[in-house]
Amino acid sequence: MNNNFKIYIVHYQALKERKKNMEDSLRESEFSYYFETKFDRRNLNEEDKKKFYGDLKDSYKANFLSHINCYKLLSESSNNFALILEDDSPPDRSFYENIDKYLRKLPSDFGMFFISAGKNNFHIPIYLRKPFKRIYKKEDKPSTWGGAGASRNADAYFISKKYAKILYDEFNHNDFTTDTTIDWWMNDVIRKYDIPVYWAEPVLIETNKFESSF
């Protein structure tokens, strides 16, 4: 696979330091990038909130909607896949030095490819790792080391245009509502459509560089 992709950054505008750190990281790179800021937790309207029920906080709703809008933008673009980052996950030297090697090994029919350990610090266990192997197929079943399914939080992941459109359409179905966060919902959709999911190990993006903003 080539590295012709765009980076979409889910960003909460009040956190200006995060944007600066992200821009400092990306400015010298060859990648185009875009800050997704359409949905602000401080002023979501009733239309924004209509897909959610229960006691989910507006911060999680805004985050969820931001990922969904990234899927929309990718599905309407000329790119075959994109990298989605949350604003606490700026790439560092390891990402730039290794991304080409990882993408060359990633199957072309991938659906999602998680490249950070996420806020839950999920890793492929040492007993499952193989020498020189960097890309691992992740089953959609819960595990003690990998959470409730195939997602790996939502801090840093590639997604293909095909499956971005599927997730976008699933969210926008007339009957759809949810009471959960984007990464938990991903697991439901991954299972429903048998989306091929892969994890990077070693990871390419370090997360948890800031206190949680949720």
Residue ranges and their predicted role:
Residues 1-85, 89-214:
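An acidic/histidine-cluster motif and surrounding catalytic segment
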